[in-house]
């Protein structure tokens, strides 16, 4: 037997018991003829005692131990003299009677502690060492608990887990596919799925009325802190449902997770139309933990000789409560923030509403106190508040104000990661128009159904058609999205035509799918939740990388295994491939 207990298990009730433990040496220290060793495993840390006066040979062996050595010990549980309230085992320690080295270790390239000295690149290269850190390990434990709870919840609601193919055909729209050459079919390729969308709809047509899958998906796109080339979805589909049925089930799932994982009772989700989300927050994934909504004020700014406002399509403001004290330096920092190329605002205008009732603005030259008071009244500012104003093309300025709003929310401590604001964003547009390519694109995907009352607009004003689509947003993060699907053959063909797909193209790409509609497709809809983002939100993480065991870096590389890598000419030849420009 290698061990009788784990390093996080023993308590004062185990006093005087003989135990066997295994684990890694976290650290050791020598003091007055005693060697103290912190032994760590997945479950916690237990302190070991090697007393020189009791057993000199054992004491000398303990002196040889280095960080991350793997050892086995036998000993007696005793009450700890200097208790450590920071760890669950802090009331006890082990007086060691036997020590066995299972494997020595080289000196790790960084300290394996919560506050490590290892940079991102180094920790990614030695990810198996980084995973020993309590912080990363606890994130993966949280992930496991969430997946387990999700499966239990969906199973209790009659969902069936069904696996769908990983090697599929490439389809248009969305991000780029990862392509896999077929050795047995020269010149032909598979792609890795961006989602199981078509297959889960086919399962509905097949009669599996409640499906789910915790599934790997792949997108060859530029990476950010909330994106990875391979990611995990909780993918679900239901037959004979309307939008409200789906929202109810998955709002229930989210409440179940908050209750079982975090012990929190979450009230009902807010509902916000896409149009109102953009109008009041400048974003289709607003953080509703705090107010500071966008207010349009252009109509009360024009005609005063300030061309910047007069010539702008949109002038919008937010009110930062209690920020009238902001200094010139702080205002300059905000100006630099909004003018950063990633945001791209032309400038920042402010109105300071002091506690004495006086008004001060960066455009005093053009606007009277009466004018400024109208702005103050419009945004609902109080004495002591600061009004921040941006201007320009409407949609771009709303996006810029959204970024400024989030920045102010962070500065004012309004985005507490222990607080949660959950909502559904609904009534998305069905299409987006690309002015460069002169064509419509699906806002979500081509299989989303239009709202019944807007179907008549498909022929005349498709840009105004709303979709039976919805996104789940928590703390300004899009956790997932879904829709009611098209289940009518003729309507699906019409949507493809509006997207510019010819009949021959539609048949070659989606023939198998639309043909299935001819054989009794039920009304159906579904949702896909991003598991990585879900876990990161629960854990309060800024990046999803810290809740994925073996993530890629921002260049899409796994520096630990060296992927992607060059393959030999022989293997390329087997696949009938030639890499252009390869010397």
Curated annotation (Swiss-Prot):
Instruction: Give me the residues that bind ATP, please.
Output: 219-221, 228, 478, 530-533
* GO molecular function, a single term: aspartate-tRNA ligase activity
InterPro entries reported in the protein's UniProt record: Aa-tRNA-synt_II, aa-tRNA-synth_II, aa-tRNA-synth_II/BPL/LPL, Asp-tRNA-ligase_1, Asp-tRNA-ligase_1_N, Asp/Asn-tRNA-synth_IIb, AspRS_core, GAD-like_sf
Record field: catalytic activity:
tRNA(Asp) + L-aspartate + ATP = L-aspartyl-tRNA(Asp) + AMP + diphosphate
Give a GO biological-process term: aspartyl-tRNA aminoacylation
Q: What is its EC number?
A: 6.1.1.12
Give disulfide pairs as residue numbers.
none
Instruction: Map out region (Aspartate) in residue numbers.
Output: 197-200
Q: From which residue to which does any coiled coil extend? A: none
Quote the record's binding site residues for L-aspartate: 173, 219, 444, 485
| UniProt function note | Catalyzes the attachment of L-aspartate to tRNA(Asp) in a two-step reaction: L-aspartate is first activated by ATP to form Asp-AMP and then transferred to the acceptor end of tRNA(Asp).
Q: What is this protein called?
A: Aspartate--tRNA ligase
Q: Which organism is it from?
A: Azobacteroides pseudotrichonymphae genomovar. CFP2
The organism's taxonomic lineage, starting at the top: Bacteria, Pseudomonadati, Bacteroidota, Bacteroidia, Bacteroidales
